[in-house]
């Protein structure tokens, strides 16, 4: 069993029931929701690893636009989960748009259970890798800002900082600090 929490969002109760039965055999926890608006509290908690998101919800238009809008909304949050889009009306353009908007994968109803599980696992790994890369980039920017700030210090400021660092290391012991600074 994989230690992941999966959310299934679909307006068809039969689809929710079948997916829950299928996925609870493989994943630690499954949450089913009948509309994406019910997913909002889970975004702030950040505990969902992946979402299977239907493309159409109670809309007369079955073009997937509603699903794409919800995809954008979910992916716009920090630490957004991996998303696998699902629709009965799949086409290449819809799949490409989903991937361009941040979905990790796309699957068409009726689905193959093994294929869906593989896609979810791959999506979780891909999303985790993307999150790690994002964190590393943020850390690099922070380090660069710190280095630039240090480079802008005057010589006197650098000396003062060095003396303060030594004093901190010596826990305020002036004799020890003077010795380390080679002051007689």
Task: State the predicted function of each range.
Residues 13-31:
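Two-component/phosphorelay signaling modules centered on CheY-like receiver
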Residues 32-50:
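Acidic, metal-coordinating helix/loop segments flanking the phosphotransfer/catalytic sites
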Residues 62-79:
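Short amphipathic alpha-helix used as the core "switch/output" element in two-component signaling
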Residues 110-120:
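C-terminal output helix
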Residues 120-136:
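The C-terminal output helix
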Residues 148-184:
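Bacterial C-terminal helix-turn-helix
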């Amino acid at each position: 069993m994989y230690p992941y929490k999966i959310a299934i969002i679909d307006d068809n109760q039969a689809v929710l029931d079948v997916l829950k039965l299928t996925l609870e055999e493989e994943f630690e926890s499954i949450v089913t929701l009948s509309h994406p608006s019910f997913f909002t509290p889970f975004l702030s908690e950040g505990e969902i690893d992946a979402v299977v998101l239907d493309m159409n919800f109670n809309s007369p238009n079955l073009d997937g636009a509603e699903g794409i809008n919800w995809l954008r909304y979910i992916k716009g949050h920090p630490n957004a989960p991996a998303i696998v889009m699902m629709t009965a009306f799949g086409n290449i353009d819809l799949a490409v748009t989903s991937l361009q908007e941040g979905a990790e994968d796309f699957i068409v109803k009726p689905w193959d259970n093994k294929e869906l599980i593989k896609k979810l696992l791959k999506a979780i790994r891909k999303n985790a890798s993307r999150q790690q890369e994002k964190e590393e980039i943020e850390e690099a920017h922070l380090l660069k800002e710190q280095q630039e700030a240090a480079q802008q210090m005057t010589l006197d400021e650098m000396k003062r900082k060095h003396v303060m660092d030594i004093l901190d290391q010596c826990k305020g012991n002036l004799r020890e600090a003077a010795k380390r600074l080679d002051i007689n």
